[in-house]
Every structure is written in C-alpha cells, then in structure tokens.
Amino acid sequence: ANHQKEVCQSLANKIISVAEIRKDAVAFVSPNRGSFLSDGSAGSVVVFDANQITDNVISFFAPVSSSSFAVFDSTYKYMYDRFADTFRYVPMNGDIAGLCARNDINNFPWFSPAGTARGAILNAVKLAYNPSQTQRDQLYSNRVNPIIFSPGGGIILFGDKTGLGKASAFDRINVRRLFIFLENAISGAARDQMFEFNDEITRTNFVNIVEPFLRD
C-alpha cells in the first residue's frame, strides 16, 4: 500500500525498536512507495528521475532511528506475481532478508550478503531505481545500501551497511549478525550452567565450552 511517508517512517522506527529490545533480530526496511512510484488505474509507474529519487530515499531514512539492528535498502523491484497473474513493484526488504538467510545456509552469518558472489537478487525483471556511481556514494554515506543492475552480474545488493549512524564495527551487516550468532550460542551454553555451584569447576567448564567455540 502507498502509505504516507511519515506513517512508513513511524512503522520503521517501531520495528527497529522491537529488534533493539530483542537483540536477536534485524529489521529490514525499504523506502516508502511514494519515493519512486505513482499507483493509478493503469498500474504503477516511476514518476521521478534518478536524482529526485536519490533525494527522496535519503530524505525518507534521515529521521529513521540509528541502529545496528536495522538494514536499509534503496529501491523496489518489478516482478511477476503468480498468485494474481500480474506484474507489480514490491519493496526489496524481503529480498535482503532472504539474502541473509541464504547466506546462513550456504556460508555463515559473518559473511557479507552483498556483492556478485552472495548478493544476487532473484525473480526481478527490473528495478524502479538503478543508482549511478555518484548516487550510490550518496546513498551509502546516508546508511542506505544501493541495489543495482550490473551488466553481466544481474541485480545485486551493492552495500553491507547497517542503519547505525556513526562509524563503528557494528555499521556492517556481517559484524552485527556475527555478534547475534555468538550471543545466542554463548547464552545457550550459559543456561546449561544455571544453578550449578559458582566455583572454579563450574567456571572452568564454561570457559572450556566457550573458548573452543570461539576459536573455531
């Protein structure tokens, strides 16, 4: 649905706050539909030029919460909806989440989901917005991961930033997802030590569980 920009920004902030509280999830957010498209009886059409869309996307994410538990993307894709037997534009936050899931299956969470090796977007006919090199730089410096069409490479995710607004190790998707993975694994090991005596044996057992895991 083509909701107002402010409504979409508020929803994005709520989703990010949930991820921040949980500490074991990441919120994937796409810009509002009105940043690119006009929906009418004849269908959806791209209504802005690339420079205007760049400004629209940056403007959309500017007030959205700074968080390493969020990932922002830049565009919508045009795809075939087999259930409705029609083509339509859809946001790409689901695709970026899918890249991370596919990365977990084929590699590990601490691998970047971006690039031609792991960042290929499937089931896309075209993009509503394909940023130029200059526009990619503008987006990336404003926490937005560009999605581009690359000749010979197809449609790919071309950035691996989180929504964190300051320089940090956690401004990278793979670093944040690595720490989510580690925290979940270590907390599971810690649960096994609950209600044991707080003595040298218990502490040594815990260290012997965690240290080999971290080394591997």
Task: Go through each PLM region and give its residues.
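Structured, hydrophobic secondary-structure cores that serve as assembly/anchoring elements
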Residues: 1-216
